[in-house]
A protein has these predicted regions:
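Secondary-structure edge/capping motif, primarily at the C-terminal ends of alpha-helices
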Residues: 26-33, 60-63, 67, 95-98, ...
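Carboxylate-rich helix-loop segments that flank metal/cofactor sites and access channels
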Residues: 54, 58-109, 113-115
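Alpha-helical scaffold segments that form or flank carboxylate-/histidine-based iron centers
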Residues: 7-15, 36-55, 76, 100-106, ...
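Alpha-helical bundle segments that constitute or directly flank the non-heme di-iron/ferroxidase center
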Residues: 2-34, 101-126
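Outer-membrane beta-barrel domain signature
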Residues: 42, 50-51, 55-57, 62, ...
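Amphipathic alpha-helices that form helix-helix packing interfaces
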Residues: 15, 22, 29, 52, ...
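Preference for long, well-ordered alpha-helical segments
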Residues: 103-156
């Protein structure tokens, strides 16, 4: 049972970091765009990801874990990719150029990385059904956010 919980906690830790990357990325993007409607959507997605973090951390605690800045070795590569896209190299360049389309493009890329992280989590054997339900719902919400960002980008 302990090994199963360790696996659950490791998956949750990876997803917490993914959601935190998304939250930070959307906050940065929202602060950089001028269009009020686009800014509002990006702020909404930042809040959504903050909610994901809370839900995932709460779930980790239910399984006896803590999500204090921990990722697995498997998750490290996905987190590095997510961090690069979600924020911190490409998004900074787009923000510096004050190019809303480029900023939204980086948000799309960050969500693609998040979707991959969630898909990876869903492929983990032996996760409890209730956790799979949470992961699937959050993944669907990320997919919907990505589609919204794509639509916003196309209207600019």
């Amino acid at each position: 049972m302990e090994n199963k919980n360790e696996k659950v906690i490791a998956v949750l830790n990876d997803l917490v970091e993914t959601a935190k990357d998304g939250q930070k990325g959307f906050e940065t993007a929202a602060g950089a765009v001028e269009n009020p409607a686009v800014k509002a959507e990006l702020q909404r997605f930042a809040q959504q990801r903050a909610g994901f973090v809370s839900e995932l951390e709460s779930t980790a605690h239910q399984y006896g874990g803590s999500t204090e800045n921990k990722t697995t070795v498997e998750g490290a590569a996905l987190q590095a990719a997510g961090a690069v896209h979600r924020g911190w190299i490409n998004l900074k360049s787009a923000v510096g150029a004050n190019d809303s389309k480029a900023i939204l493009g980086e948000c799309e890329t960050g969500d693609e990385a998040a979707i991959k992280a969630y898909d990876n989590a869903l492929q983990t054997d032996g996760l409890p059904v209730e956790l799979l339900t949470v992961i699937q719902r959050q993944r669907q919400d990320i997919q919907a956010a990505k589609q919204t960002v794509t639509s916003l980008k196309e209207t600019l």
